[in-house]
């Protein structure tokens, strides 16, 4: 995180950006700024406009109106090639590496010959503390290291503006810490990072500034240290008058009051030797008034278990739900 308030001109300044799809206003005059050595976190619910704004900055989608100021020059629209030339690189949530190619081949893929510099690559690896075997296959890397290879692809192209889309979504806490350590080293070189995430604790740890998008607008923006968690949550999910709610929104508001109440410690869900696709012999009990955390690496079976409990997948074993008027029991051989 940047600790000094003395900054050069912004790396990126988006002004009054508008975008419409089929008559629906997706972006409504967005202003967004990124400085050197800064992490600017971008939050918002699904459909808030985050992805559209980043696609416009990366040259994937044109804006209907507005300007992007980069390096002191104004642009009405960019192409992906032009964005790369201006030093903008989008790192997707799922790294787009070729698993059967080496790490070196992945980093250099698609680069012009004049940009191919092994010494530059080695310098970047050393600066970021990466100890890759450049000749090993990219498919052998864990998710955190794949993210770093994607970032290195951008840095080899002299990118100064990195857009990280949910970079920790598939990472364990240890992998997240390793990624953050390398990002801090990267920030010291003057790179600016747009960090898209829904994880507030991580955002508070890594971000200098936070902007919250809602319904195509910037609902809240400021220094991380000056924004409370309540402010951020309220900006993401504001209280609105009932008359402006849709029927489905009203239903969701009514549901909590209609749920049966149980004394704390009363079992509301019990699993006994539950087996399904991606998991086996899972036994656990969820009690009223508690939050039961389910942790594991990517592919450990967490999603499959949740989908089985919801009824989307077949199961073998025993499930008992006690929260209904009468206990509900379901078992399969």
Curated annotation (Swiss-Prot):
Keyword Nucleotide-binding applies: yes
Gene3D superfamilies on file: P-loop containing nucleotide triphosphate hydrolases
Residues involved in ATP binding: 44-51
GO molecular function per UniProt: ATP binding; ATP hydrolysis activity
Entry-linked SUPFAM superfamilies: P-loop containing nucleoside triphosphate hydrolases
Family (UniProt): Belongs to the ABC transporter superfamily. AI-2 autoinducer porter (TC 3.A.1.2.8) family.
Protein's name in the database: Putative autoinducer 2 import ATP-binding protein LsrA homolog
Classification via InterPro entries: AAA+_ATPase, ABC_carbohydrate_import_ATPase, ABC_transporter-like_ATP-bd, P-loop_NTPase
Domain ABC transporter stretches: 12-240
Alphabetical keyword list: ATP-binding, Nucleotide-binding
Listed Pfam families: ABC_tran
Organism superkingdom: Bacteria
Cell wall biogenesis/degradation is among the record's keywords: no
